[in-house]
């Protein structure tokens, strides 16, 4: 009977990453909701966070962080 609990826990851990795939950005509305813009190419300070459709990528503006040395 205990093996059922172990198998259930194993399957839960094994299949949990697949739940994130349904949260992918794949439309203009989802892109804008995440603070992105639909562009043909993500250039400069924009980085790709998803796709709007087959031609456009969802790009988000990101300011590079200053690297500080820890003394």
Curated annotation (Swiss-Prot):
It comes from Mus musculus (Mouse). This is Beta-defensin 7. Residues 1-22 form the signal peptide. One of its GO terms (cellular component) is extracellular region. Residues 23-25 form a propeptide. PANTHER family: BETA-DEFENSIN (PTHR20515), DEFENSIN BETA 4A (PTHR20515:SF2). Has bactericidal activity. The modification Pyrrolidone carboxylic acid is found at residue 23. It is found in: Secreted. SUPFAM superfamilies: Defensin-like.
């Amino acid at each position: 009977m205990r093996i059922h609990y172990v198998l259930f826990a194993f399957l839960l851990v094994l299949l949990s990453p697949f739940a994130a795939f349904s949260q992918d950005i794949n439309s203009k509305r989802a892109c804008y909701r995440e603070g992105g813009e639909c562009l043909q190419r993500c250039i400069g300070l924009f980085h790709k966070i998803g796709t709007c459709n087959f031609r456009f990528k969802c790009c988000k503006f990101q300011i590079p962080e200053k690297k500080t040395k820890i003394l």
